[in-house]
Amino acid sequence: MSITIKLLVGLANPGPEYAQTRHNAGQWYVSQLASQENIQLKAEPKFYGLTGRIQFAGNDLRLLVPTTFMNLSGKAVAAMANFYRIKPEEILIAHDELDLLPGIAKFKLGGGHGGHNGLKDIIQKLGNDKNFYRLRIGIGHPGDKNRVSGYVLGKAPSSEQNLIDQSIDEAARCTHILGQDGLEKAMNRLHSFKAEK
């Protein structure tokens, strides 16, 4: 059973100082999809972000990278969803995930925010509706919750970055499977992916 995704969002903090930080993994994924489709993301002030449009499983798919700060991501997501009348279950949010190792990415439908400030704001701005898809991109955990903030706002060493990049490439390929064949097939492929060190 195919799934209609109409809005794909990559969470990030704006500005060059954050571009290569782990917290911006969601943006790396959306940029990868845009580059595969040969489109440039453009600033769109009314949606508080960088936007683009591709054809996806026969439907228009809007791409969005909020240029608000992470904890205000919901403002951009809600603005675009409201304008195009996109329901929460037609949205896929890509974000960095502390609870997965670098090189691992997983699709998921629904759930809480797990302490992720971007997800927290999106859930709130969508009227507490959590029923959207997520792509969780593993960045690993620093081992101490007091070090999380510095960790997500830091750059991964090149060995870890290579693993993250591989998982993002595979996730981009699996996104097409998600649209054409449904969540189960996309999950089966993505969740069995092994990044090469």
UniProtKB/Swiss-Prot annotation:
Bilayer-crossing regions: none
Q: Which residues bind tRNA?
A: Y18, F69, N71, N117
> Could you tell me what reaction this enzyme catalyses?
an N-acyl-L-alpha-aminoacyl-tRNA + H2O = an N-acyl-L-amino acid + a tRNA + H(+)
Q: Which UniProt keywords apply?
A: Cytoplasm, Hydrolase, RNA-binding, tRNA-binding
> At what residues does the UniProt record annotate the site feature described as Stabilizes the basic form of H active site to accept a proton?
D96
Q: Where in the cell is it found?
A: Cytoplasm
Write out the catalytic residues in the record: H23
Q: What is its EC number?
A: 3.1.1.29
A GO BP entry? rescue of stalled ribosome
* InterPro entries, sorted: Pept_tRNA_hydro, Pept_tRNA_hydro_CS, Pept_tRNA_hydro_sf
Which GO cellular component does the record give, naming just one?
cytoplasm
Per its record, what are the GO molecular function terms? peptidyl-tRNA hydrolase activity; tRNA binding
Pfam families annotated for this entry?
Pept_tRNA_hydro (PF01195)
Task: Spell out the residues of the site Discriminates between blocked and unblocked aminoacyl-tRNA.
Answer: N13
Q: What does this protein do?
A: Hydrolyzes ribosome-free peptidyl-tRNAs (with 1 or more amino acids incorporated), which drop off the ribosome during protein synthesis, or as a result of ribosome stalling.
Task: Report the NCBIfam families cross-referenced here.
Answer: pth (TIGR00447)
Q: How does it assemble?
A: Monomer.
Q: Which family does it belong to?
A: Belongs to the PTH family.
Q: Which HAMAP family match?
A: Pept_tRNA_hydro_bact
Q: What is this protein called?
A: Peptidyl-tRNA hydrolase
